[in-house]
Amino acid sequence: MNIRPLHDRVVVRRVEEKKTTSSGLIIPDSATEKPSEGVVVAVGNGKKNDNGDTIALDVTIGNKVLFAQYAGTEIKVDGKKLLIMKEGDIVAVIK
């Protein structure tokens, strides 16, 4: 991946929801909400505190995370849709 977020920003790839029901019906995109779950694909170096020291991020590449529904900015890198957001927009890490 050719992107490196700055400071306390994180790049997340959304986890796609199922497009069909258990009975085989296809669900159109207009009938589903965007998922608020994803996988971290890149992280910044961290946020600087008042002393100028860098505070490392709590999330790492590969973490499965939950984030606010309208968090982040959608970007396209290498033909893939990704979200770039501040670490504070992530509400939980799924283990």
Swiss-Prot record:
InterPro entries (UniProt xref):
Chaperonin_GroES, Chaperonin_GroES_sf, Chaprnonin_Cpn10_CS, GroES-like_sf
Could you list this entry's UniProt keywords, alphabetically sorted.
Chaperone, Cytoplasm
Q: Indicate whether Cytoplasm appears among the record's keywords.
A: yes
Entry's localization field: Cytoplasm
List the record's Gene Ontology CC terms alphabetically.
Answer: cytoplasm
Q: Which GO terms describe its molecular function?
A: ATP binding; metal ion binding; protein folding chaperone; protein-folding chaperone binding; unfolded protein binding
- Which Cys-Cys disulphide bridges does the record give? none
Q: Which SUPFAM superfamilies match?
A: GroES-like
GO biological process terms held by the UniProt record: chaperone cofactor-dependent protein refolding
Q: How does it assemble?
A: Heptamer of 7 subunits arranged in a ring. Interacts with the chaperonin GroEL.
- Family per similarity comment: Belongs to the GroES chaperonin family.
Q: What does this protein do?
A: Together with the chaperonin GroEL, plays an essential role in assisting protein folding. The GroEL-GroES system forms a nano-cage that allows encapsulation of the non-native substrate proteins and provides a physical environment optimized to promote and accelerate protein folding. GroES binds to the apical surface of the GroEL ring, thereby capping the opening of the GroEL channel.
Q: Which NCBIfam families does the protein's record reference?
A: PRK00364.1-2, PRK00364.2-2, PRK00364.2-4
Q: What is this protein called?
A: Co-chaperonin GroES
